[in-house]
Amino acid sequence: MDVTSQARGVGLEMYPGTAQPAAPNTTSPELNLSHPLLGTALANGTGELSEHQQYVIGLFLSCLYTIFLFPIGFVGNILILVVNISFREKMTIPDLYFINLAVADLILVADSLIEVFNLHERYYDIAVLCTFMSLFLQVNMYSSVFFLTWMSFDRYIALARAMRCSLFRTKHHARLSCGLIWMASVSATLVPFTAVHLQHTDEACFCFADVREVQWLEVTLGFIVPFAIIGLCYSLIVRVLVRAHRHRGLRPRRQKALRMILAVVLVFFVCWLPENVFISVHLLQRTQPGAAPCKQSFRHAHPLTGHIVNLAAFSNSCLNPLIYSFLGETFRDKLRLYIEQKTNLPALNRFCHAALKAVIPDSTEQSDVRFSSAV
């Protein structure tokens, strides 16, 4: 039953003698402006929107994403890779993690171009393309969240166990950790895919994205468990900072070192939360008995909502390089030196130096650079 119609019916019964209104016009502006917002939040409200209206809204959001976020994500992640590789002799342990994170984000940003033009979720109609896109997205999604989780743990080790972690926090161990994270991301995707594919070999319309067991794994392993670990790490870090309150000379430097990682994690949480809520709502709904397998896809039932949450998830990969550039003091210094080496225009060099320094005052202070590189 329509929530809006039910509410109006209750209101009329409270006032006897009120004439019954005419049948509601499903194309009235009032319904179309108010109801979709509620429906999008509940992943259940695009029923009153016509196909044309859903297309217009999706096209508008896709244009905003393509104009404002996609260039930042594509150029920014490439810039992170180029600058850090150019200064590989000065590469720190956090730089290794951010390079791998930039690789995963760059792949997701490139993949987002398909989603931007997939306004009707049409590629979910093709089983092979649907499965390929789901595998491609999950591998890089897992790698992003796993890298963020490991970076939070590494940050806690660097701050809380600074004197005892010199043997553990080495570049060799960092490279080994990156390799294991990529292997874990691929395994978390391919192992469930192999298992469920053997069970659905006879289904012509089988898509990896529609398997409920895979969706439960994505929500738990790709969102709930990692952020529980991240929350624990940051709670321990806060306790360390509180204990170091009397060391006023170290506290500002440590807060600057934490600001970048904390911002990246918060942006990831905000961007990926709608996607996981959308999937969770679908998982909590009971499957209709006798429904055709191809028609049970929640993205078929709610294409506009699925499009919105996908764009929100892709936005994380676009915002990560922006946060990294603005809050990473070591990276800004490398970027300034890279521009000076590659250009012979003194005016441009002075402008870039002033712009990078204006982001956070005293960002080029040598003591802060040494501290940021150390952690």
UniProtKB/Swiss-Prot annotation:
Pfam families: 7tm_1 (PF00001). The keyword Zinc does not apply. It is a multi-pass membrane protein. InterPro entries: GPCR_Rhodpsn, GPCR_Rhodpsn_7TM, GPER1-like. SUPFAM superfamilies: Family A G protein-coupled receptor-like (SSF81321). Residues 85-96, 154-175, 237-259, 328-375 are cytoplasmic. GO terms for molecular function: chromatin binding; G protein-coupled estrogen receptor activity; G protein-coupled receptor activity; nuclear estrogen receptor activity; steroid binding; steroid hormone binding. GO terms for biological process: adenylate cyclase-activating G protein-coupled receptor signaling pathway; apoptotic chromosome condensation; cell differentiation; cellular response to estradiol stimulus; cellular response to glucose stimulus; cellular response to mineralocorticoid stimulus; cellular response to peptide hormone stimulus; cellular response to tumor necrosis factor. Glycans are attached at residues 25, 32, 44. Keywords: Acetylation, Apoptosis, Cell cycle, Cell membrane, Cell projection, Cytoplasm, Cytoplasmic vesicle, Cytoskeleton, Differentiation, Disulfide bond, Endoplasmic reticulum, Endosome, G-protein coupled receptor, Glycoprotein, Golgi apparatus, Immunity, Inflammatory response, Innate immunity, Membrane, Mitochondrion, Neurogenesis, Nucleus, Postsynaptic cell membrane, Receptor, Synapse, Transducer, Transmembrane, Transmembrane helix, Ubl conjugation. Expressed in placenta, endothelial and epithelial cells, non laboring and laboring term myometrium, fibroblasts and cancer-associated fibroblasts (CAF), prostate cancer cells and invasive adenocarcinoma (at protein level). Ubiquitously expressed, but is most abundant in placenta. In brain regions, expressed as a 2.8 kb transcript in basal forebrain, frontal cortex, thalamus, hippocampus, caudate and putamen. Induction: Up-regulated by EGF and TGF-alpha in endometrial, ovarian and breast tumor cells. Up-regulated by progestin and by phorbol 12-myristate 13-acetate (PMA) in breast cancer cell lines. The chain crosses the membrane at residues 63-84, 97-120, 133-153, 176-194, 221-236, 260-280, 307-327. Disulfide bonds join 130-207. G-protein coupled estrogen receptor that binds to 17-beta-estradiol (E2) with high affinity, leading to rapid and transient activation of numerous intracellular signaling pathways. Stimulates cAMP production, calcium mobilization and tyrosine kinase Src inducing the release of heparin-bound epidermal growth factor (HB-EGF) and subsequent transactivation of the epidermal growth factor receptor (EGFR), activating downstream signaling pathways such as PI3K/Akt and ERK/MAPK. Homodimer. Heterodimer; heterodimerizes with other G-protein-coupled receptor (GPCRs) like CRHR1, HTR1A and PAQR8. Interacts (via C-terminus tail motif) with DLG4 (via N-terminus tandem pair of PDZ domains); the interaction is direct and induces the increase of GPER1 protein levels residing at the plasma membrane surface in a estradiol-independent manner. Interacts with RAMP3; the interaction confers proper subcellular localization and function in cardioprotection. Interacts with KRT7 and KRT8. Belongs to the G-protein coupled receptor 1 family. This is G-protein coupled estrogen receptor 1. The lineage of its organism: Eukaryota, Metazoa, Chordata, Craniata, Vertebrata.
